[in-house]
C-alpha cells in the first residue's frame, strides 16, 4: 500500500439547531451547524408536522380547481 496518499482524519463537531452536538471524525474537520439531526427530525422522532399553513392547499384548489371545471 502506498504511504501518504490518504487524507488525514480530524475531529469534526456538528451542532444541530435543537442543541444536539455530534462529534465524529472527518477529512474535512472543523465545526458545522445543522438544521435537523436524528434527534429532532420528524422521521426519526415519529412526530409529524402539519404542512398546510395558512390554507395554502385550499388556495391552490380554489385557483386551479376552476380551470378544470371550465374545460368540462
From Swiss-Prot:
Its cofactor is Zn(2+). Zn(2+) binds at residues 16, 18, 37, 40. One of its GO terms (biological process) is translation. GO terms for molecular function: metal ion binding; rRNA binding; structural constituent of ribosome. Keywords: Metal-binding, Ribonucleoprotein, Ribosomal protein, RNA-binding, rRNA-binding, Zinc. It holds the Pfam family Ribosomal_L31. One of its GO terms (cellular component) is ribosome. Binds 1 zinc ion per subunit. Belongs to the bacterial ribosomal protein bL31 family. Type A subfamily. Binds the 23S rRNA. Part of the 50S ribosomal subunit. This is Large ribosomal subunit protein bL31. It comes from Alcanivorax borkumensis (strain ATCC 700651 / DSM 11573 / NCIMB 13689 / SK2).
